[in-house]
Amino acid sequence: MSLPHLAPEMALLERPLIDVRAPVEFARGALPGAVNLPLMDDAERHAVGIRYKEAGQGAAIALGERLVDGDLKARRVAAWRAFAERHPDAVIYCFRGGLRSRIAQQWLQEAGITLPRIQGGWKAMRQCVNAEIEAAAARPVLVVAGLTGCAKTELVQSLDVGIDLEGHARHKGSAFGRHPLQGPSQIDFEHALGAALSHATHGCVVEDESRMIGQLDIPLSFWQTMETAPRIRVEMPLDWRLEQIRKDYIDTLWRTYRDHYGEWLGWSLMRKQLSSALKRVRKRLGSARFQRLQRLQALAFREHQRGNTQAHEAWLAPLMLEYYDPMYRYQLEQSPYEALHVGDWESCLAFARDWSAALPR
């Protein structure tokens, strides 16, 4: 009986994916939504690879069948079967869509479940993702700019054609923007971006970013398009921006740390992150300004423990006014591009919606 297969473009349709590669391969990069349920673990894969080099494919297959047999084989088939029963539209893939995914298909079929595999595997799907990013770089892009705290990310998230670059990178793009949880690898970031761009087939709206978001690079072709794309600029008063920054960088950050690590460890980790972030901009602040902000930050931590997170505004306000705002205004002065629209958050959202509605279909 033939085993069904699908074109690699299916990687962009966000179907549940069973990645049967070894954990070490999965860690280097996977596709959004993929779950690693390997045919062989790292040690087994290594042993089979050595046998392949020494004695060829037949000997390697024979060794693999001996290593993954009996109870071990039954456990791995059971894991695939359990996933398939929860996700009947699941798809299997390995590195090249060859032997490992076909073996997994066959074993599952013997257990009464038929799932398709991706033709060409991870390698072909990655080529599709890269092609999608290249295609998106040739489509219309609108960039949302503005001072820190203008809720640019929320504006992008409110649009059907919005691509949340910081969300995919799990980083807010500044010294204070690191997410409490581990961020994706470069490959994982590109895969998530490619999958998102595949839904914005006529154009997209993104937030103004430098090439690097944390430790991740926006793919060059797409970033070059962003650099020359038309812009809109959100302008909001300081008190509004300050409240937004406190919510994003203090309240939400604290809830995430507390929920994942508990009260005591979460508090310690959050305080360490914010203290370290301030130290990273010490040279640009200058010694006197840094020491002043450090003292204000320490006082804010004390008030925070009493339930007063608003106390953080005492150090966030000068950080914005004396560091981030001047830096952004300098960048704005160097830009050769005029904004298509300048206004408050609501007017910029309306403009972006009108822009996306006017895209050629």
From Swiss-Prot:
GO terms for biological process: tRNA wobble uridine modification. InterPro entries: Rhodanese-like_dom, Rhodanese-like_dom_sf, SelU. It comes from the Bacteria. It holds the Pfam family Rhodanese. GO terms for molecular function: transferase activity, transferring alkyl or aryl (other than methyl) groups; tRNA 2-selenouridine synthase activity. Residues 11-134 form the Rhodanese domain. Keywords: Selenium, Transferase. It is an enzyme of class 2 (transferase). Its EC number is 2.9.1.3. Transmembrane segments: none annotated. It catalyses: 5-methylaminomethyl-2-thiouridine(34) in tRNA + selenophosphate + (2E)-geranyl diphosphate + H2O + H(+) = 5-methylaminomethyl-2-selenouridine(34) in tRNA + (2E)-thiogeraniol + phosphate + diphosphate; 5-methylaminomethyl-2-thiouridine(34) in tRNA + (2E)-geranyl diphosphate = 5-methylaminomethyl-S-(2E)-geranyl-thiouridine(34) in tRNA + diphosphate; 5-methylaminomethyl-S-(2E)-geranyl-thiouridine(34) in tRNA + selenophosphate + H(+) = 5-methylaminomethyl-2-(Se-phospho)selenouridine(34) in tRNA + (2E)-thiogeraniol; 5-methylaminomethyl-2-(Se-phospho)selenouridine(34) in tRNA + H2O = 5-methylaminomethyl-2-selenouridine(34) in tRNA + phosphate. The active site is at C94. NCBIfam families: PRK11784.1-3, tRNA_sel_U_synt. Involved in the post-transcriptional modification of the uridine at the wobble position (U34) of tRNA(Lys), tRNA(Glu) and tRNA(Gln). Catalyzes the conversion of 2-thiouridine (S2U-RNA) to 2-selenouridine (Se2U-RNA). Acts in a two-step process involving geranylation of 2-thiouridine (S2U) to S-geranyl-2-thiouridine (geS2U) and subsequent selenation of the latter derivative to 2-selenouridine (Se2U) in the tRNA chain. Belongs to the SelU family. Monomer. This is tRNA 2-selenouridine synthase. It comes from Chromohalobacter salexigens (strain ATCC BAA-138 / DSM 3043 / CIP 106854 / NCIMB 13768 / 1H11).
